[in-house]
Amino acid sequence: SHYAEGPGKN
């Protein structure tokens, strides 16, 4: 759940 946009986004 950690992507470039931030944790919890995907």
UniProtKB/Swiss-Prot annotation:
Keywords annotated in UniProt: Membrane, Mitochondrion, Mitochondrion inner membrane, Oxidoreductase
Q: In which pathway does it act?
A: Energy metabolism; oxidative phosphorylation
- Record's keyword annotation contains Mitochondrion: yes
Molecular function terms from GO: oxidoreductase activity
GO annotation, biological process: oxidative phosphorylation
Membrane topology for this entry?
Single-pass membrane protein
Give an example GO cellular component term for this record: mitochondrial inner membrane
What does the UniProt entry say about where the protein is found?
A: Mitochondrion inner membrane
| Keyword Mitochondrion included in the entry's annotation | yes
Kindly state the subunit structure of this protein.
Answer: Component of the cytochrome c oxidase (complex IV, CIV), a multisubunit enzyme composed of 14 subunits. The complex is composed of a catalytic core of 3 subunits MT-CO1, MT-CO2 and MT-CO3, encoded in the mitochondrial DNA, and 11 supernumerary subunits COX4I, COX5A, COX5B, COX6A, COX6B, COX6C, COX7A, COX7B, COX7C, COX8 and NDUFA4, which are encoded in the nuclear genome.
User: What task does this protein carry out?
Assistant: Component of the cytochrome c oxidase, the last enzyme in the mitochondrial electron transport chain which drives oxidative phosphorylation. The respiratory chain contains 3 multisubunit complexes succinate dehydrogenase (complex II, CII), ubiquinol-cytochrome c oxidoreductase (cytochrome b-c1 complex, complex III, CIII) and cytochrome c oxidase (complex IV, CIV), that cooperate to transfer electrons derived from NADH and succinate to molecular oxygen, creating an electrochemical gradient over the inner membrane that drives transmembrane transport and the ATP synthase.
- Family classification: Belongs to the cytochrome c oxidase VIIc family.
Protein name, entry field: Cytochrome c oxidase polypeptide 7C, mitochondrial
Protein's organism: Thunnus obesus (Bigeye tuna)
